[in-house]
């Protein structure tokens, strides 16, 4: 099975288990990208679901994607502590994450949970299905964006 398809399926599995979009995208991507996370690191994502704890702001699936992309990009760039200028040190991460953000918005219409899920409904079958599509798409966008960095 193709890596992206496997990661997308894993994100849906996690979403069904947890009902947490941020956790699902973050953990599925970390697994696909061979980023080790302990339970505390995984649990860090929980409060970002529902657009930051149900507030409707930045989509949790997008948050999880940006967090995983940041970890992966920093890992692939190696030690950059000697670069004194923080902007220069982190610019490749900013650029990669900005690209993921733009693609997510292009495909979903908004980065905000409140727009993607106007009633902040995490219960109905219809909305859960929509969230599954959004989480799966976020994982696919992220892996596609990062594929050129893989070693």
From Swiss-Prot:
Keywords: Membrane, Signal, Transmembrane, Transmembrane helix. Residues 1-32 form the signal peptide. The keyword ATP-binding does not apply. Its main location: membrane. SUPFAM superfamilies: Multiheme cytochromes. It comes from the Archaea. It is a single-pass membrane protein. InterPro entries: CGCAxxGCC_motif (IPR010181), Multihaem_cyt_sf (IPR036280). GO terms for cellular component: membrane. It is found in: Membrane. It holds the Pfam family C_GCAxxG_C_C. The chain crosses the membrane at residues 45-67. NCBIfam families: C_GCAxxG_C_C. This is Uncharacterized protein AF_0456. It comes from Archaeoglobus fulgidus (strain ATCC 49558 / DSM 4304 / JCM 9628 / NBRC 100126 / VC-16).
